[in-house]
Amino acid sequence: MSAIVIAIVVLTILALVFGVLLGFAAEKFKVEGNPLTDQIEALLPQTQCGQCGYPGCRPYAEAIANGDKVNKCPPGGAATMEKLADLMGVEPEPLNVTEAVQIKKVAYIREDECIGCTKCIQACPVDAILGSGKLMHTVITDYCTGCDLCVAPCPVDCIDMLPVEQTTKTWNWQLNAIPVKQLQEDKPC
């Protein structure tokens, strides 16, 4: 046999042995997570914005599972808070006004000042910023959660947080609050 074939066979056998060892170790030392934490995390919006006072949605889910309040997630809003309260078996509370943003704001990039460094793109947890290296960037306002994480990394300070204008598209319509009268159809004779 040539030296190359022997080397390939030896490396293949080593790879198989190490693969089996790693597979065994992964099963033997597997850490089981809290299923309640997983359920709570599934309900959270996964923006990783930190507005709740925790560094991301997973740490906040762990805190809720350990007894923290369920009303600290502004991006999730009242609907998420009610689902969390139902899951935890507690009474729904209004969103914590010290944590919640009163007026929804979104990031706005002054494109004429943008140098295209991509630091804001890397900081955005919901991929709401478009752009590429050395080119201007822009924000997709429909995706922006207003978490403010893109402002600090900007080296030229060209990102502003502006309130969302109230239009028919952004208005919080409460259609269930409008009474609807059901009309009975006349049957043909």
Swiss-Prot record:
Its cofactor is [4Fe-4S] cluster. Keywords: 4Fe-4S, Cell inner membrane, Cell membrane, Electron transport, Iron, Iron-sulfur, Membrane, Metal-binding, Repeat, Translocase, Transport. [4Fe-4S] cluster 1 binds at residues 49, 52, 57, 73. Its main location: membrane. InterPro entries: 4Fe-4S_dom, 4Fe4S_Fe-S-bd, 4Fe4S_Fe_S_CS, Elect_transpt_cplx_RnfB/RsxB, RnfB/RsxB_Proteobac, RnfB_subfamily. It is an enzyme of class 7 (translocase). [4Fe-4S] cluster 2 binds at residues 114, 117, 120, 154. Residues 1-26 are annotated as: Hydrophobic. Its EC number is 7.-.-.-. One of its GO terms (cellular component) is plasma membrane. Residues 32-90 form the 4Fe-4S domain. It comes from the Bacteria. One of its GO terms (biological process) is electron transport chain. Binds 3 [4Fe-4S] clusters. Residues 105-134, 135-164 form the 4Fe-4S ferredoxin-type domain. It is found in: Cell inner membrane. PANTHER family: ION-TRANSLOCATING OXIDOREDUCTASE COMPLEX SUBUNIT B (PTHR42859:SF3), OXIDOREDUCTASE (PTHR42859). Part of a membrane-bound complex that couples electron transfer with translocation of ions across the membrane. The complex is composed of six subunits: RnfA, RnfB, RnfC, RnfD, RnfE and RnfG. Belongs to the 4Fe4S bacterial-type ferredoxin family. RnfB subfamily. This is Ion-translocating oxidoreductase complex subunit B. It comes from Shewanella pealeana (strain ATCC 700345 / ANG-SQ1).
